[in-house]
Structure formats: structure tokens, C-alpha cells
Amino acid sequence: MLAVWLMESKALSETAHPVGEGNLESILPENSSKAAGPMPVDTGGGRYHVQWDDSAPMTPLGQMVFFAQFLHAGGRWEDFCKDAPFGFTSPNAPSHEDVLGSLAFSILCGHTRYAHVNAVRFDAVSPAMLGMNKVVSEDSARRNLKKFDAMEARQWQRKHLRETWERLLCEPWMLDIDTTVKTVFGHQEGAEVGYNPHKPGRPSHAYHTYWIARLRLCLDVEVRPGKQSSSSYGMPALWELIDSLPVECRPQGIRGDCGYGSEANMLACEKRNIPYLFKLRQTVKIKNLISLMERQGGWVDCGQGFEGIEGEVRLSGWSRQRRVIIARRLVKKENPEATKNATPLLTHYGMLPVESESHEYIVLASTMPYGVDALVRLYRERGDAENPFDELKNQWGWAGFTTQDIDRCQVTARLIAQIYNWWSLYARLVDSERHREAVTTRPELLGGVGRQTKHAGQTQINISLTHSKSNSIKAKLAEASAFLQGLITTAEQLTNPQRWELILLRIFEKFIQPKLQNTGLPTLATG
């Protein structure tokens, strides 16, 4: 009886708590999750048979080989990695090329987080083009950036940024300065609530940047805490950069918005005999000057709907009178009362007297030796300096790659600027007509499936392009590659800086060789 009772209780205990569906593999078709052969996949276009292939050496960055050739021809990548102050001591530490190359691949692909490095982790073809052994993990990339001493990293990165653009400064050029804000989320060092027009009240970092106008090349970037967005925090690094340049390579002028139109910045420019063009805030004295000029008359046409006139003013805190340019244009403003009293029928057909004309004013302080119309045009063209901010933040990663400490944020900001400069120059070499943003150039000049094969000691890459302009892309790349290969094979006696100079001369031949006629404006500020 005891044995029977034990058997019945065991059966009851097994049925009281059913196991549900049990092991999922037991109800799936046999070996379906580990199928050795092709998997049938039904789609709207019919059935496809899919099979994984982890052994074929392939890359989604098929055209990376041409960019690697560009960096090698000028010695940019080798010198950059060789000088990196990592200070590795362990024999198991990754190479400089592995760490920097992993980040470079991620940046080139438009990633914004260290975790995105995993997307290129098992590329079996592209890493070798940059002398890499492997793509390191996200943790390794983030952790190894901590090996840098902040000052050593600053000197190393500024040196190589300078080597990228220094030869171009032998031509007359204009320098644009501006500040952008990077919103951060969390408890990062320097995450302070300061000026943040897009997300007020959010902590941020301030990026003080310096540009070669029109060429959209970044001279340098300084990352500061969120409350240090004022120009006074970014100008010391700029003066350090300018003072290190030979006099003949200094800018023909400096342009900045109203955040830079202070007495201190003007005095610093005047001390160095560098002309400036700064926008001024419309204080009471400036508004009185505008009223005086309106009564006085004598406005001249400056193009694009602008009119201009010049005068002199000495604001409170200024040491002397300075020349100012006042520009105005008509703008239409809505009349709320007219909109409120309008009939629905007139509203539907847009026949409303709801707009009145008034003037919008821009006041500029300048020591540049140009007329009113030229100065208004120069400042209007400064709007082009806003475009690189949008590109670097939304297409290159300036809005990401955030770490707890601000030093690594600074290193990655400069690294992104370096990769951006190299890629921009490469894109101009392939197509010198104009600057094109990464959202356009990546699909054209980086995408494509590359399949690598090796035979008889030769490595061959077969590239398949899916771009609609593939024929044009192939022709331009063939021309650029032939030029670079000629430098590598026939100019072996030249040093890396000399070869890089030849590359820059090829890219900017329309700026450097045929000088602008009948104008005194800086060559690299117009075009």
C-alpha cells in the first residue's frame, strides 16, 4: 500500500505543475536552428534559399582601398599612428594601428557611440589596408584612450591636424571662429547647464572651433565644460595657434558672430595686425547709430537684398572709436490683428493684408580694407561656417562618443576632426568641383561589396557597386588612384610632407594656381 501511495503522489506532483511548452527545440522542425544547408525563406518575391558564409573574406566598405591609398601616398596614417603617445608596456597590448584604426573605421561609417565599433568588428578585409591586425572591441578602444596623457595627446593631435592643412595657409585665407554645443546625458565631467539653445536646461559641453573658410577644414577644436561657451574660453587656444604660424601664413581676416565682438578680441587682433569682421550686439548706442544712419541716408546696394552704410562708434568699454558697417534688408512681419479679423474665405486663398515691411539690421565692426558691399558679402558668406557644425555633429560623431572624463571627449573630438579633414580632402581629390557632405560621399566613395582573393602572391579585391552613378564613380576613382599610385612609385625620393604637398596642390589647383582676378578678397574666403 505504501508503494502504491508513493506512485500515486508522484504522478499527482508531476501533473500539478505542467511544464508548459517544454523545450522550444522539441517542437521546431529537426535541426531547424542549426541547419547545415540553405534555409528556405519565403518572401513576396518568391522563395529564397539562404546560407551563412563566415569564411569568405568580404567587406561592406569595398572602396576603402582607395582611401587607404590616399592616406598612404601622403604618409598621413603611418605618421599619425607612429607618433601616438599611448605608452603601452604590456607585450599583449594592441598596436597603435589597431586602436586608432578601429575608431577610424567607426568614425568613417558615421557611428556616434563606442558600442558601434562592434558593427565593423569582424571585417576580414579592410583592417589590413591600414596596417591593422584586427578591430579591437569597444571596451578596448574606450579603455586604451585612457592611456593618453592629456597634454601629450593635445600636442600629438594638434601637430597632425596642422600637417594636414599647413601648406594651404601660404595662400590668402579667412579664418572663421564659432562655438557649438553638445548635449550630454548623465554625470560626465564638465556636464554643466549653460548655453544650450536646442535643449535648454540640459547639461552640455562647449566645442570651440576654428575653420579655414570655404574649404571647410577644421584647424582645431577645444572641448570645454558647458558653462564655458563664451568666446573668452576659446580664444586663448586660437591665439596660441596663430602665434605659432609664420607671419606670411596668418589669416587675412577673422570672422565671428556677436559672441566675438568684444573689445578684448578686437585689441588682440589689432595687436597682431590681423584684420577682423565681428558682428556687434545691438545695444542702445548701436540702435541710436542705426536711427542716425536712417535719417542721414546714403545706403549702397550690397546684393541679395541687402543695403549697407558705414560709420564710426565708440561703445562703453571701448578704448577708441572703430569703423562699423550697418547692413539692412526688408523683411515681412505678420500683423496679428489683421489675421484675427480676416474672413475664412480670404484666409483660404491667402489673400490677406497680414504682412508689413520693416528692416532687419546687422551691425559689423571691421578693420578690413574693403568697401561696404564687400564686407557685407564677406559676413553673409560666413553662414557657410554653420554647415560643418551640422555635418560633424549629425554625420561624423561630434554629438556622441561621450565618456565620463572630458579628456577622452577632447581626444575623440580632435580624432573626428582629423578623419573628417582627411575624408573631405579625399572627396575633393576625386571630385574637386565642390565640398560634398558625408551623407553623399559615403555611399559614393566608401560603399560597395568587396571580395578579396589571393593567388600567386597577389591580393585582389573585386568590388561590386550598387550606386546609380557607378560608371562616373569608377572613372573618377581610376583617375585619382592613378595619380596617387604615380606618387608612390615614381616619387620615392620625396619625403611624406613633400608628397602631401603635391596632393594638396592637385586638390586645390583652382584655388592656388589661378588667382582671383580684379578683387582684393582672400583667395580661400571666396570661390
Name what the model sees in each region.
Residues 117, 181, 372-415, 419-426:
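Short amphipathic alpha-helical "interface-anchor" segments enriched in bulky aromatics
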Residues 70, 102-103, 117, 137, ...:
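Short, conserved catalytic/metal-binding motifs centered on acidic residues
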Residues 399-462:
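Basic, amphipathic alpha-helical segments enriched in Lys/Arg and hydrophobic/aromatic residues
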Residues 58, 89-98, 354-355, 403-413:
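Structural motif
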Residues 8, 12-14, 19, 37-50, ...:
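An anionic, glycine-rich sequence signature occurring as long contiguous blocks
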Residues 2-202, 208-247, 450-527:
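Dynamic "connector" segments at or just before major functional cores
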Residues 189-194, 268-274, 291-297:
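Short secondary-structure boundary/capping segments
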Residues 228-285:
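Domain-level cores of phosphate- or acyl-group-handling catalytic modules
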